[in-house]
Amino acid sequence: MKLHQKSIFYTILGILVLELGMTKVQAQQVDGVLDPAGYVNKYDTDFDGVGPRVYVLPAPRTREELLTDSYKEKTAFQDSIDRALDLQQLIAEFKTTRAERHVQYLLSPIPNTTSAWNELVEREVERGNYNTAYGLLHTYASSSLKEGAISQALGLLQTALQHAQKTSNVSDIAVIQYNLANIYLYDKNIQQAGYFQEAYYNTAVQQKSIIDQANSLLKIALIQAHDKDYRSAENNIIRKAIPLLNRAKAYEQKIIAWQTLARIYQLQNKHTEAQWFLIQARDLANSKNFNEELAEIEYMLAYSKFVQKNYNVAKKEFLQADELAKSEENKLLQLAIIDKLGQIYMTQSDFNNAEAALLNYQDLRTELFGDIL
């Protein structure tokens, strides 16, 4: 009887030991399965309630994953930067009329509402002072353009042109037409842009102004390029504008001509040709000490290298462009540069510089465009 009891005892004891061993093995197996990332280091292995024994969260995202997502999120904003650069160029190229010099006494203080501007203009129109009326309208259009009010600027210039055409001020009429052409091109209205630029060119021919003719031909070429008539655009610059500028020894305008031609090649994705003309522009600018366009030229050179995936050279040229843009205090161009530099750093897995570039980008973008949503 005692032997039988001992046998039962050892059998039960063996079963208990076996179960404990199995539980331990299962726990060890669970340890390996429940948290492969290794972040859960303490949990109740005896839990037998509702739900899973352990809620395992995904491992924290890596620095590379966070940066990759941030760079993807800002990709959609590149068009806004390019558009802002075009507007900045448009404002810089806006010509003033002679009539504006004679209306300054009426603009102290400057009207701060649309109705105040309208009252001022209407009073001069009623008096038959059309010179003053279009001078005021042109000034108002310039102010509207700087605020990015494109439609308003176009409307004001159209009205200014109507009043200017009641006078004999041919030069001012041409200036208004030139400004209209440029704004219509920015607004992607190719037909109207071409109409007004041709009118400006015809006046330049009549007045035998070589530089104005060449400048207008450059604009006509850009209009043609945006209309995808690339052959005519190239010929207008190479065969017409450049010879005129050579005859006038207008070196600064020739730099702009090379840039314009390069931009037309970039529109066609012909980046090797674009770089050749940009190098001509850069060499001429350096030889004549015309530094105003150097930052833009260097940026365009770097951009072509970037598109060709020649990242090491592109990086070097973007950094040079950045130094030039900083010396000019051109923050919008700095933003465009750091945007591309960051993309290069990410492509090359240089995450330290990519992170620094992203922070710089965010600071500049907030300063120029407001808070980033």
Regions found by a protein language model. Name each.
Residues 118-123, 158-163, 168, 198-206, ...:
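Amphipathic alpha-helical segments of tetratricopeptide repeats
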Residues 22-135:
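N-terminal leader/linker segments that initiate helical-solenoid repeat arrays
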Residues 135, 175, 215-216, 254-256, ...:
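Residue register of alpha-helical TPR repeats
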Residues 113, 153, 193, 233-234, ...:
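Single-residue signature of alpha-solenoid repeat helices
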